[in-house]
């Protein structure tokens, strides 16, 4: 286990024995709910309220390599599609699951075309999200 202090709300604790799920959503209550859900599955979760905060940590802390990213589409500043585009251009590779309250025409298609594993509408069914996260982890482990 590795514990590092970053600009995030608290220290980031990395446990290489558990899958790490990164959650990016500007709604703190969604972040808390998703973190509880992920941790109930014996996985680690780190939450971020902006895409820039998440990307900055990826760049600043090479050991921070999430196994999956749950990413809100509509956020102030950098939206989820922009985060995904930056990931695709950079050296970081991870399955991306989009969540959104606004299923605008074309957004789902853009996300999937850019490589998103799934696109779930809020409020999402916990079981569907769990199944989708497990599928993402399975795909990542199979290369």
Spans of model-derived segments:
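Two-component/phosphorelay signaling modules centered on CheY-like receiver
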Residues: 28-46
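Acidic, metal-coordinating helix/loop segments flanking the phosphotransfer/catalytic sites
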Residues: 47-68
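Acidic catalytic/metal-coordinating carboxylates
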Residues: 49-50, 79-82
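Short amphipathic alpha-helix used as the core "switch/output" element in two-component signaling
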Residues: 56, 81-92
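Receiver (REC) domain active-site loop signature in two-component systems and cognate sites
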Residues: 75
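Alpha4 helix (beta4-alpha4-beta5 surface) of REC/receiver domains from two-component response regulators
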Residues: 82, 103-118
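C-terminal output helix
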Residues: 106, 124-134
């Amino acid at each position: 286990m590795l514990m590092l202090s970053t600009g995030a709300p608290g220290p980031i604790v990395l446990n290489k024995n558990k899958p790490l799920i990164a959650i990016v959503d500007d709604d703190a209550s969604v972040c808390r709910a998703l973190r509880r859900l992920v941790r109930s599955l014996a996985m680690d979760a780190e939450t971020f309220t902006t895409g820039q905060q998440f990307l900055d940590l990826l760049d600043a802390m090479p050991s921070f390599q999430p196994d999956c990213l749950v990413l809100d589409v509509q956020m102030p500043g950098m939206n989820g599609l922009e985060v995904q585009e930056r990931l695709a251009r950079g050296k970081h590779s991870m399955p991306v699951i989009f969540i959104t309250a606004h299923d605008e025409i074309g957004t789902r298609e853009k996300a999937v075309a850019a490589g998103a594993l799934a696109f779930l509408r809020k409020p999402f069914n916990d079981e569907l999200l769990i199944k989708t996260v497990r599928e993402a982890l399975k795909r990542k482990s199979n290369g």
